[in-house]
Amino acid sequence: MAARPRKNNVSVPNLYPLYSRKVNKVYWRYKHPVTGKFHALGTNEAEAIAIATEANTRLAEQRTRQILAISDRIATSKGKAITTSTWLDRYQAIQDDRLKSGDIRLNTYKQKAKPVSLLRERAGMKLISAVDVRDIAQLLDEYIAAGRPRMAQVVRSVLIDVFKEAQHYGEVPPGYNPALATKQPRRKITRQRLSLEEWKKIFDIADATHRYMGNAMLLALVTGQRLGDISRMKFSDIWDDHLHVIQEKTGSKIAIPLSLRLNAINWSLRDVVARCRDYAVSAYLVHFFRSTSQAERGAQVKANTLTMNFSKARDLARIDWGEGSPATFHEQRSLSERLYKEQGLDTQKLLGHKTQQQTDRYHDDRGKGWSKVAL
């Protein structure tokens, strides 16, 4: 005679086995701890354990939020501090409103999600006024140790803003900002700058392969704009003899005269725009000249396609980049700034930077140039 199946071989709370003599099987049920109702989970023990464990976790989180909410209401009424988790809920709501009103860009909004989630995970149960420098420093150290200093910079920047907002709403004392007290993570930039000679080599290969690549590279060098903005440029953006650009990253509005000429390559913006006009009807300056398996004739060339084809042409040019990583499409923006600076142009306005310090970063050739001794 077969042995009777064990009925109580699991220790997951609220999970119960029900043995059926009729079919000689064990059915699993989950008992809701609040309503007392049973929910059938079938005969698969592993699945039943997983479902019950997940249900218990969610109920525990729900209870924790309810307890925190009650605790925070009491604390607020008594003028005491609230928990970090509750403040982060309010901070998220503030960011939602800022996004809707246009105060921040979508990319900025998305960038805040991970750092907020990390702080909630590590210090959500602590009072917001009890989060200290060590809590933040430990978060940053993990990214630095993993070789991700750029992400550490992002986390620090967002958490500085979290505590700035907390100050504005009186949830922490004035000046209280443990994130600001942490050391700024340093990131060594290994990507090489692009020289004009290197640009010409890449341009010749890229233009011969895809004419739209030649157009995109000329626009990048003559206008100094970012990759995404170049991809989105339309003929309808041209009026009053200017090309109008609303920068995707910052929202800056720039009107570039068609008469602007980059002397180093002897191309004006008007010349480049004329080159972009061809037999393919398109709303975009950078567009496909013929239909392909992935795009129709006249369709916009997306930023990813420009990046990929630039990299291919760059590799075919067989340029020695030394110990650094090869230049990317974006490096044309720095080259443009340096060439226009030699012409005496106000490159800060052209690039759409709020401060001269931002522009100066682009002017740094990262060791490519030579310092000449004046006699």
UniProtKB/Swiss-Prot annotation:
Keywords: DNA integration, DNA recombination, DNA-binding, Viral genome integration, Virus entry into host cell. Disulfide bonds: none annotated. InterPro entries: CB, DNA-bd_dom_sf, DNA_brk_join_enz, Integrase-like_cat_sf, Integrase_catalytic, Integrase_lambda-typ_DNA-bd_N, Integrase_recombinase_N. The keyword DNA-binding applies. One of its GO terms (molecular function) is site-specific recombinase activity. The active site is at R226, K249, H330, R333, H353, Y362. One of its GO terms (biological process) is symbiont entry into host cell. Residues 350-375 are annotated as: Disordered. Pfam families: Arm-DNA-bind_1, Phage_integrase. The keyword Transport does not apply. Residues 189-375 form the Tyr recombinase domain. PROSITE patterns: CB, TYR_RECOMBINASE. Residues 82-167 form the Core-binding (CB) domain. Belongs to the 'phage' integrase family. Integrase from the cryptic lambdoid prophage e14. Integrase is necessary for integration of the phage into the host genome by site-specific recombination. In conjunction with excisionase, integrase is also necessary for excision of the prophage from the host genome. This is Prophage integrase IntE. It comes from Escherichia coli (strain K12).
